[in-house]
Design a protein with these regions (language model features):
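Solvent-exposed interaction patches of small proteins and small membrane subunits
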Residues: 1-121
Length: 121
């Protein structure tokens, strides 16, 4: 892989990792989906989390395209397809977002993705 392309990919992976860490940190106090739905701060947290999930999913799609689908298969422990699919659901069906799914992804799936920069460097 060309050096400048490799640097760009590592930079983007770091941005994804930072966004994932923010999602995890910002949702530490959210224990159940009711924490999203029953308070104004909870709804704001859900909405901001969805925006970051869109950004992460879009960045992953870009990485997949820019690496000719060669990078993501090297890390099968990450649910890449799920991350890209969640981005599509949030972006195109925003009013049908399931807070339970968002919370589950943040609590269960994102910790693996948060190690991405270390995995790929």
């Amino acid at each position: 892989m060309e050096s400048s392309l490799k640097q760009e990919i590592l930079y983007r992976l770091k941005k994804i990792e930072t966004a994932v860490q923010r999602l995890i940190t910002q949702n530490e106090m959210v224990k159940t989906v009711n924490d999203y739905y029953c308070t104004p701060w909870g709804m704001e947290r859900l909405e901001s989390s969805c925006m970051l999930l869109i950004a992460v999913g879009e960045s992953i799609k870009g990485l997949d395209k820019d690496t000719n689908k060669q990078l993501l298969p090297l890390y099968p422990e990450v649910d890449w397809k799920g991350a890209m699919g969640l981005r599509d659901i949030i972006a195109h069906h925003y009013f049908d977002i399931d807070g339970e799914t968002v919370l589950d992804v943040i609590k269960s799936d994102l910790p693996t993705l948060s190690q991405l920069g270390r995995l790929c460097s």
